Structure formats: structure tokens, C-alpha cells
Amino acid sequence: DFALDKTTEESIRSIGKSNELNHLSADRIWMELRTALSSPRSANFFSSLVSLGLTDPWFSKISSFDLDESNSPRLKWIELELQNNFSLHESLELPKEFIELTNLSFQLAAIDIEEDQENLIDKLEKINFHRNQKEVEEIIKLKFFENKRDYLIKLKDNILSKDFSILGEAPKEDMMKMKKDLYIESIKESK
């Protein structure tokens, strides 16, 4: 840890007040963000942005940055999004993999254990556990999912244990009902 001298701190604060940051490209901001997320002390970067008044325009919605520093840069980003109501990516141009992971984490966060089956099935289809199994397993390890982690693990395991390949052989008119039945069975087994 180190401390800025007063003159340096004042100079940095004046940059934030001058709107100079508005003229930086989203790509440049992403490069700095990627470096910060790769750091073993990523939270210090965000803490400094806030304390030095450098959040506008790129991080104006950041309010929390309690990160598990042992996580990968991708998972640190997801932690930030989860803690800040998925509002950070709106002003940034993120790589596709970060956008997809953000969307997947948003879908997982939206799952409610007490939700009615129809809504839950819609959400489960969007998550696509078969295609996104590895990413789902990474995301649900995050502290944010502590209260529903067991349920999500059961749900994932029960869905993955079903043989959805039978849908390819089913008559088109029966396919949707059969798929829905597989999801309903998985949901019931997970409660």
C-alpha cells in the first residue's frame, strides 16, 4: 500500500472534475479495467476511482466492489455486476465473452426458488445448462449465490441428467410438451 501526496491527489481529482475522462475511448477504458481485474488487488482500483472522484462517466453506477481476489478477471467482473445491479456494462464496450457471462449471471440471479413453473421453465431454457454448464458452475460459486447455490446445483444436475436428445426423434407437435415435462420433472426433483 502507498499514499498519494496531497499535490498528486489534487491533480488527479482535477482530472475527474474536468471531464477529461469523457474523451477516453471505451476500448482504452476496457484495457485499464482488464488490467485492474487481473490484479491481485482489484478492489483497490475501484476504491481509488470512487475516492478520487473518477467514476464519471464510465463507472458512475458503481457502489460496491467487494471482490474475491482469488477469482479470475471474468468472475471478478461478474461479482461487480451482481453487486451493482447489472448496470456497469451499459457504458462500456466489453468483449463478447464478458457480455455473455454477464447475461448468464443475470439469468441465474433472476431464478427464484418459489417462482411459478412456466416462468422458471422460460428462464431455464434461456440459461441452457447443457451449453453453459462450465460457466454456470463457475458463476454459482460466487458469494452472491450463497442463499440459492444448493438449489441451483440440484436444478443443474437434474436438468443435465435428463435425456433431452429424445426430443430430436419426437414428432414436432409433441416436442414442446416433452421438453416442458423434462423441465418440470427436474424442477420437482430439485425442491
Question: What name fits each language-model region?
Answer:
Residues 1-21:
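Internal alpha/beta core interface subdomains
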Residues 30:
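Active-site pocket-lining segments that scaffold enzyme catalytic pockets across diverse folds
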Residues 41:
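Non-catalytic nucleic-acid-binding/docking modules located in mid-to-C-terminal regions
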Residues 44, 48-191:
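C-terminal subdomains that position terminal phosphate/3'-OH groups for nucleotidyl transfer/ligation
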